[in-house]
């Protein structure tokens, strides 16, 4: 047994694979590790068609790479817009146009009924040929160890701003932990780990959760979104538009922005929003 004075749980997260019949097939990959990438490359050597379940950043990056490798790619998006919680409709349309320009098909409101070795059958009966299927449906925190130990956890291990759990001298950090919102990003995990380490060693440091930007490169274009990009129905936004950029203001303050194509000003824009 190991003895400790302070303990940090950093159990991470695992890919969420929806309970679709056939999702455990040899041609289905949820990409999380280098081993998963190696599997994709091996299957892609003989595959002609690929389907990507999930239209988030990682799914679209995978779709872009597969298209570059010469595969015929179809993206299956559950919702009616790509990345609806993060980008506005105009940015989503920009992405759709870029995808079409690279020959990548997008099906929205597309729910998978089953997967087999030759493709995906949708709930509405449509058949998508795919010898390779990538599932990109988000992650789920690995919390079983914490729950078995009596640590408070629902979707994530619950921590305060010092990364403390409900048990004395037990901390948690990274994708497994949350103060209420989790972006499951490396930068966030690194910041949380630093705070947990300081406090576990007897220091006193508090974690400040910051909004995280969305950055995407693929299909010959790029996209950046940060802050509130017009998603609140009860807010009267003022929208400023320039070629490849939209700025959202509310109450006289800049609250969000979306850049498409040329995103070199993303750091400047981020600072302007944070300072507003």
Tell where the protein language model's regions lie, with residue ranges.
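Glycine-centered tight beta-turn/hairpin loop motif at sheet-sheet or coil-to-beta transitions
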Residues: 1, 123-125, 220, 242
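Short hydrophobic core segments
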Residues: 2-14, 53, 73, 128-138, ...
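Glycine-rich dinucleotide-binding loop and its adjacent helix/turn
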Residues: 6-69
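Redox-cofactor binding/interface segments in oxidoreductases and associated redox assembly factors
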Residues: 9-10, 52, 122, 135, ...
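FAD-binding beta-loop-beta segment adjacent to the flavin cofactor pocket
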Residues: 15, 157-171, 228-246
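FAD-site-proximal beta/loop scaffold in flavoenzymes
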Residues: 24-47, 118-121, 126-198
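Rossmann-like dinucleotide-binding cores of NAD(P)H-dependent redox enzymes
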Residues: 49, 58-113, 207-223
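Mid-to-C-terminal Rossmann-like scaffold of FAD/NAD(P)H-dependent oxidoreductases
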Residues: 176-267
